[in-house]
């Protein structure tokens, strides 16, 4: 019987069934219905429903007993919501047919996601009786009065004292709600998590209303030491745009700090007063000093991208870090890398003073990123010892990376080479001596030709994009590949019969070649063939021939 299959497999099967057939399945018998609804309650994020072609009454009645329900991007309307009055957690994000009237039926909901709905106004938030968590992201009509309705069940007069709280809001997302002001914080005193990113500027004095906040995402603050003193329980702070001026102390419980692109006053932060900090994003903080990194000695994940004043001395304090990004820290040299030998991930893109010798210190780092930039900068050399699981190389404009470098990557499993026009066919021969290499990605490497691909014949996963020299003949060399991905290679107009191939992904910038599709029809042994095409391609082209079930056409704007 179907229900005797492993739970994980059943979850995948049921989550892939289209909504109309899913509801028919619920009507088979009580045993099947109870099993599926239990699974639905336990894994609400695995299921989403589109009610467009379903009988509204029949479909919703089966969902009445479900406590956690995901109906995001569906066609559910106000009349259907009245059948879900007892739901505990409901996701109706991006449901354009929902209005204030529909929300009036959800009096008992505890967790609600109604984001991306321009129909919801302040009046729609006054009927909740138990709500604790709500997502109002991109609900552009919500104002401070709506927050009053949410918390007290009514709007307040200017001289009216704050009444008894009806709903104790613990978590609220007001991102991109441009009519909300920081004055609404006085109604969210018991909140533990507030997101007000990309809204109007927040004023310092309003922080006094949220002393119990643990997660705060907020924009445009000019935060002083006095204002932050009240936030003694905060664990995670994300300051958005408008370059906050920060003098942080008293944040001894803070575990995550995201503070990117602060050009001024960053040098005044004393990280020693944040002993519990484990994650910090300080990218673009150009005035960050070496001495400040002493306070980050216990941080496990650290982003110092484009912190131009950081030197090897600063890295000497970071011997315990596990994941670090020091890309475009131009003062870092080979000597500094010896302090990162215990890391699991190191990004050294654009570190122009790092040479071959520096890679000796990184030989035990599982994941190493060298390059991966769209700027016309050249990256560091990689000659030397290397035990890299993942390597990215890009913009090799000064011939710093040649085939010789690849000989040292004996334990590399994935290599990505981007926009390196100095990499030629002969360089790829180095890959034949890398037994652990399982994936290679060649992007914008226009000096690689068909002959170069012959060196990749034993690599399981091969991706080739934006190459104007490789043709169908080159693909024929990939005899042992399990997955091949082709994007924007105009000379590839047919595929050879590669018997070991299990998945093929093909992206075209122009019209779909019918000869190519007929060619693919012959390959039943390939489990999945994805053909991505531009929206402007006439779909009538696809109806002129019979298409095998293993071929899937996907409209893609790329």
UniProtKB/Swiss-Prot annotation:
The keyword NAD does not apply. GO terms for cellular component: SCF ubiquitin ligase complex. SUPFAM superfamilies: RNI-like. Keywords: Leucine-rich repeat, Repeat. Residues 1-47 form the F-box domain. It comes from the Viruses. InterPro entries: F-box_dom, Leu-rich_rpt, Leu-rich_rpt_Cys-con_subtyp, LRR_dom_sf. Pfam families: LRR_6. GO terms for biological process: SCF-dependent proteasomal ubiquitin-dependent protein catabolic process. Gene3D superfamilies: Ribonuclease Inhibitor. LRR repeats lie at residues 73-105, 139-176, 177-220, 251-284, 285-317, 329-361, 369-395, 420-444, 445-477, 481-508. This is Putative F-box/LRR-repeat protein R542.
């Amino acid at each position: 019987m179907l229900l005797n299959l492993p739970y994980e497999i059943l979850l995948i099967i049921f989550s892939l069934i289209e909504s109309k057939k899913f509801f028919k399945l619920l009507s088979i018998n009580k045993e099947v219905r109870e099993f599926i609804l239990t699974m639905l309650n336990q894994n609400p994020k695995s299921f989403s429903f589109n009610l467009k072609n379903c009988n509204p009454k029949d479909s919703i009645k089966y969902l009445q007993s479900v406590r956690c329900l995901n109906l995001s991007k569906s066609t559910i309307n106000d009349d259907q919501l009245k059948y879900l009055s007892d739901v505990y957690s409901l996701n109706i994000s991006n449901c354009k047919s929902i209005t204030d009237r529909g929300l009036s039926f959800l009096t008992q909901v505890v967790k609600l996601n109604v984001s991306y709905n321009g129909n919801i106004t302040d009046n729609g938030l006054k009927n909740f009786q138990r709500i604790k968590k709500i997502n109002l992201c991109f609900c552009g009509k919500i104002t401070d009065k709506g927050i009053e309705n949410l918390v007290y069940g009514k709007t307040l007069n200017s001289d009216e004292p704050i009444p008894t709280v009806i709903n104790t809001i613990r978590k609220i997302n007001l991102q991109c709600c441009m009519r909300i002001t920081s004055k609404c914080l006085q109604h969210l005193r018991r909140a533990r998590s507030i997101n007000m990113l990309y809204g109007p500027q927040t004023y310092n004095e309003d922080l006094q209303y949220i002393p119990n906040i643990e997660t705060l995402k907020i924009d445009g603050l000019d935060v002083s030491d006095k204002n932050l003193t009240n936030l003694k329980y905060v664990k995670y702070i994300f300051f958005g745009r408008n370059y906050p001026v920060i003098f942080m102390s008293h944040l001894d419980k803070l575990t995550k700090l995201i503070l990117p692109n602060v050009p001024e006053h960053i040098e005044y932060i004393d990280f020693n007063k944040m002993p519990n900090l484990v994650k910090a994003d300080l990218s673009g903080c150009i005035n960050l000093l070496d001495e400040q990194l002493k306070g980050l000695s216990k941080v496990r994940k650290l982003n110092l991208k484009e912190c131009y004043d950081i030197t090897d001395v600063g890295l000497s304090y970071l011997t315990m870090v596990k994941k670090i990004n020091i890309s475009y820290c131009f003062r870092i040299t080979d000597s500094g890398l010896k302090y990162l030998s215990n890391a699991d991930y190191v990004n050294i893109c654009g570190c122009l003073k790092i040479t071959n010798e520096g890679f000796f210190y990184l030989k035990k780092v599982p994941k190493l990123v060298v390059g991966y930039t769209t700027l016309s900068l050249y990256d560091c050399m990689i000659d030397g010892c290397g035990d890299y699981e993942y390597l990215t190389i890009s913009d090799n404009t000064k011939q710093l990376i040649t085939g010789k470098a690849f000989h040292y990557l004996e334990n590399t499993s994935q290599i990505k080479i981007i926009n390196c026009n100095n990499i030629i066919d002969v360089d790829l021969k180095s890959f034949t001596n890398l037994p652990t290499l399982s994936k290679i990605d060649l992007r914008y490497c226009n000096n690689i030709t068909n002959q170069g691909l012959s060196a990749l014949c034993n690599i399981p996963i091969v991706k080739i994009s934006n190459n104007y020299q490789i043709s169908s003949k080159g693909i024929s060399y990939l005899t042992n590949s399990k997955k091949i991905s082709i994007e924007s290679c105009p000379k590839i107009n047919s595929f050879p019969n590669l018997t070991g191939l299990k998945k093929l992904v093909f992206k075209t910038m122009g019209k779909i070649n019918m000869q190519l599709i007929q060619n693919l029809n012959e390959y039943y042994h390939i489990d999945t063939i994805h053909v991505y095409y531009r929206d402007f391609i006439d779909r009538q082209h696809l109806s002129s021939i019979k298409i095998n079930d293993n071929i899937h056409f996907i409209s893609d704007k790329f």
